[in-house]
Amino acid sequence: MNNPSTPSARRKARRFTLQALYQWQLAGAAVSDIEAQFLANQDFAKVDREYFHDLLHGVLGQVKTLDEQLTPYLDRRVEELSQVEKAILRLGAFELKERQDVPYRVVINEGIELAKVFGAEDSFKYVNGVLDKLARQLRYAEASERRPRD
């Protein structure tokens, strides 16, 4: 049996969270309805359910704040981002801000991987750049200690 706190279980939780955020952005359905739909999915068996719940509710509870934190690092308004990029960036911003137990490089890498799978051809580069800049702000000490000197 898969341990629900393994990296692959968390990766799956992020993937489902991205899909749930995308659905919420497009349809505006109640988060409880969206969550119930995903929990009933047969493919959800090896997902870290608690992490999925925390990410989904955390992002949706802080959308405005997350968008405000992302804005200085965007080359366009949040509303002009593709729905996939918007969901990935919000998810990454939430993890950078609230999940100090997850190294910032893991957060950025997971965002890149989601963008490669679900985003447009080069959206992973954009996601990487935005989340890297945000990490320097939100996790200054962690990002500074691991960066080579210029």
Swiss-Prot record:
This is Transcription antitermination protein NusB. Signal peptide: none annotated. GO terms for cellular component: cytosol. InterPro entries: NusB-like_sf (IPR035926), NusB_fam (IPR011605), NusB_RsmB_TIM44 (IPR006027). The keyword Transcription applies. Coiled coil: none annotated. Keywords: RNA-binding, Transcription, Transcription antitermination, Transcription regulation. One of its GO terms (molecular function) is RNA binding. Involved in transcription antitermination. Required for transcription of ribosomal RNA (rRNA) genes. Binds specifically to the boxA antiterminator sequence of the ribosomal RNA (rrn) operons. The keyword RNA-binding applies. Disulfide bonds: none annotated. Transmembrane segments: none annotated. Belongs to the NusB family.
